[in-house]
Amino acid sequence: KKGKEFFNSSMLIGPEGILGVYRKIHLNNNDRKWASEGNEWKYFDTKIGRIGMLIGYDAIFPESARCLGLYGCDLVLCSSAQEGIFTHGHSGTKVRQNYPIPTGPDPNHWNHFRIRGGENNIFFVYSNIIDIENNFHGKSGIFGPDPFKFPREECLISESENINHLEVDTTNLDT
């Protein structure tokens, strides 16, 4: 809250305490009922690299992560409460591929959060809530900067509450 305005915001917290606050820029229809738009892409320099932040609907727009990538972010964090099914599977292909490209089914083949990392040579962390009864299906994940590297550098959590991790190496993202 600032004055009489409310914002959909998230904080980046590190060992030193609060490193910064990001205010959501792209508001969906539900947000517009109570929140004002943020007006600045936020990123924070940390010991592990430059971290950018998005919230939910921001990540639908490729330009959001692109701006953070152009600001030199190594990692983008996106907290979300996105409803519905927004990833789709692929049944596989009979077309032969060079090793190690997989040809079998992939339930998360069409996942634009996976692509946000690859579009911008960044690690992309997407954290969504799980509440199946109210149409929140989770589909959280940590996605590496190269969607064409196999096996993929990623860690997915489907429709369950869980904690997962992926070792993130930001030392060579400039190439």
Each model region followed by its residue ranges:
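CN hydrolase (nitrilase-like) catalytic-core segments centered on the catalytic cysteine
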Residues: 59-164
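Alpha-helix N-cap/helix-start capping motif
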Residues: 16, 58-59
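Catalytic-core segment of enzymes that process non-peptidic bonds
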Residues: 1-53, 118-162
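Short hydrophobic-aromatic micro-motifs
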Residues: 50-55, 76-78
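A short C-terminal boundary segment appended to hydrolase-like catalytic domains
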Residues: 168-175
